[in-house]
Structure formats: C-alpha cells, structure tokens
C-alpha cells in the first residue's frame, strides 16, 4: 500500500496538468497583451536584433492578485502546489521532454538561415536534443527561451507562497520561514524589476534551446530552489537575534554585489562610455571592462549570486545539509561555468585576454580564488 501511494504521487494527475496548462496559457496571454518596456536584444551575427516585452513584473503581480482573489472566493486552494508538489514536478518533467523533442524535430527540418533559427545539427541525437539546435525558437510569435525562464522564476515564487500558506494552516509558521520567504520574494521581484538585464545574459544570447535549458528553467529553478521552504515546512528552526542579523547582512551584501555587477555589465554593453562609480570606464582592448565590480574579480556577479543562495539556506540552521543543496550546487555550477567561459574568452580575445588577466587576477573571490 505504501509503495503504491509513493508511486502514485510521482505520476501527474489531471489536476496537475490543468494547473500547468492554466499557468502557461496565462503567461502566454499576459506576455502578449500587458504593457511593458520593449527591449532590443544584443546584435546577432547576422545583424538582427530580437525584441523582448519586459512586462514580467506586471504579469506576476496580476497573477498573484488573481490567485489571491480566487483563493478568497474558494475557487482554488492556495495549498494546491504544496499538496501536489510531486505531481506537478512529474507533469513538468514530461512537458520538458515533449517540448524539447518537438524543438528537436522542428529545428532539424528548419531551412531558416537567420542567426536565431538557423539549425546547428551535430548528427548526435542526444547531444542535439540536450543542447538544442536553434538559438531562439518561437511558437506563435512567443520567444520560448525568454518565456521559459520567466515561467521558472514565477513558478519559484508561487511554490514558495503555497508552502507559506501551508505553514500558516498547519500552525508551523516560524521566523526562519518568514526570513526565507522574504529573501526569496525580494530576489524574484528584483529579477522582474530588472528583467531587461536577462536579455544580455549568456543563456539568452549564446546557448541554444534544448532540454538542458528547458529543464533548468521550468523544473530545476522552481522545484530545487524551493527546497529550503519544503524543509522548513517539516522542521522547526528557531534563530537567535545575532543569527538573523548575520543572515540579513549576507543577503544585503550579496544583493548589492550581484545586482551592481550585473547592472554595470548590462549598461556597459548598451553604452560603453557610461561612467562607472562616477569615473569613465577602464576598458582593455576596447572590449573588456575592468572598472567597478569587474575590476575586483572577473566574475564578481557570481560571488553575489553565491551569497544570495547562502542567505536562502541560512534560515534553516546547520542541523542538516539538505537545505544547502542550492548553494552547494550553485558553487559547483558557477565554477564549472567560469572555467568554461575562461577558455572561450582566451580563444576569442587572445592577447587582450592576457592583459585582462594581469589587471584582474581574481576569478570570483578576491585574494582567495
């Protein structure tokens, strides 16, 4: 009986499918009709530029308001995600597999020569399915890469809110849960306030859309980044005042470094002459920024991201390694990504890169790494 029950919750129910369909339809419609700043993407190799409507913040606020009203009227339960988390996870996984298979088939048959849709086929089915064939595939004029990352970030907040509602109903709401919820909500809201910065990230401008990105956006971000909330739902942790203060400082410093570094990079790409910290930017070879945070470490934004990830886990205390899965995973991922980027940059910039390394010797954490 127990085995049957455990296997049952791993299978997608009709209700979980309905939730997923409603969610995607809402995001598609809201993304098209809600007002928002239209941003030009980076210049692609064929000279084209994609346009992105950055209305994610408005779409998120409206969605939370709609769900709140529906919960108040008894139309939908705020616990639907918390109670059916595994069912939603399995439904999302199946969707990821199906949509990436469709992307593989349509990508292989594409004859488009533009940078966004030109197929890149290696001949290895698994490789092409995993890494993708096209850079910016679309469905009914919707840029799927931008759409999926938006869905993942919003999904993370919705899962957290359902966990919060569950803890209130169970009477298990704690300082730790409140702290975790506040930090994550601020991080996610800030992401959508600065959604246009996403258009200049490596994932958007260089990575093709395959299972790796789709799975990462739709399943990995919302379901694994919320592990701390799930853990706190079943484990009560009482923090001391000094622990709360330290946790807040880690979050604030991490946010300052993360947002500041990404903002400087984004602005530099848009206008290389914009002053940084009140001074003209220092640039190596006319391409590599060595001012501001980017003169402290070559990937200072990674340091901020790691501090933020740590701040999400610190409310859980140190009694278990489980809540620290996210910062540990992120540390491994960012070191791997940083190493990969260094190789690419060395090949691309050659002598300029050697001079850049001399001026900015530290990779992520100054005087340590």
Swiss-Prot record:
A GO MF annotation of the entry reads: NADP binding
State the superkingdom. Eukaryota
Q: Which GO terms describe its biological process?
A: sterol biosynthetic process
Q: Where in the cell is it found?
A: Membrane
Listed pathway(s): Steroid biosynthesis; zymosterol biosynthesis; zymosterol from lanosterol: step 2/6
Q: What reaction(s) does this enzyme catalyze?
A: 4,4-dimethyl-5alpha-cholesta-8,24-dien-3beta-ol + NADP(+) = 4,4-dimethyl-5alpha-cholesta-8,14,24-trien-3beta-ol + NADPH + H(+)
Name the InterPro entries on file.
ERG24_DHCR-like, Sterol_reductase_CS
What does the UniProt keyword field contain? Lipid biosynthesis, Lipid metabolism, Membrane, NADP, Oxidoreductase, Steroid biosynthesis, Steroid metabolism, Sterol biosynthesis, Sterol metabolism, Transmembrane, Transmembrane helix
Specify the protein's topology with respect to the membrane.
Multi-pass membrane protein
Q: What is its EC number?
A: 1.3.1.70
Ranges that cross the membrane: 15-34, 54-76, 86-105, 146-168, 178-195, 208-230, 240-262, 275-297, 317-336
Show the GO cellular component annotation of the record: membrane
Keyword Translocase in the entry? The reply is no
Keyword Cell membrane present in the record's keywords: the answer is no
Q: Which residues bind NADP(+)?
A: 265, 269, 289, 294, 301-302, 341, 345-349, 356
Known role: Reduces the C14=C15 double bond of 4,4-dimethyl-cholesta-8,14,24-trienol to produce 4,4-dimethyl-cholesta-8,24-dienol. Required for cell division and expansion and is involved in proper organization of the embryo.
Family recorded in the similarity comment: Belongs to the ERG4/ERG24 family.
What this protein is called in its record is: Delta(14)-sterol reductase
* Organism per entry: Arabidopsis thaliana
Question: What's the name of its gene?
Answer: FK
